[in-house]
Amino acid sequence: ELPNYLFRSWIDFQLAGGDHITEYRNKWGDRNYKVSDTNRQLIADWYRGKCFLYDNRTVEGDEKESLLAITENVILQYGVDVILLDNLMTALDLEQGTAFDKYDRQSLFVKKLSRIALKYNVLILLVAHKRKNNFTANENDEISGSGDISNLATITIAYEKGKDLHPGQRLLKVSKNRLFGKTETKG
């Protein structure tokens, strides 16, 4: 969902960290933040050849190919070992399949993603949003869509504001962990 023109700004802030971000006022007096030109260049040099962005909005309808095929090709062509797909609903828009409803399509897509991850020994992060107005205590059941999304995942992580946190803080919770078994870990 992140527009390609915001990607560099977003990732630069994440990589720079709070110690390398400065505050300034724009011509209207609003408070803004920036990474210095020197640090932006250092960051750009570091991630050059490491980050590849695919924006489906820039591809003509008849040129689109399966996102799964694109993912596999990028792994093979560039040696990528971490893939971030934001988000499941957008990814499904790129998949033409024979599945009848959206839950079947979600299940099939996640199964195929899981196979790609295992086949090439890569990490695939799939963003899936929470259900609206869901009140279950199980984080995995709060994922919007097919139950196969969390069933097939090796790890599920919830990201939220948290009621008792400072406004600038967020909560990460591991609710499923097939690698190490620890869940309900907060950080």
Model-found features: residue ranges?
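Short beta-alpha junction loops
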Residues: 1-3, 130-131
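Conserved inter-motif catalytic segment of the P-loop NTP-binding fold
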Residues: 2-99
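Phosphate-binding/switch region of NTP-binding enzymes
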Residues: 104, 108-187
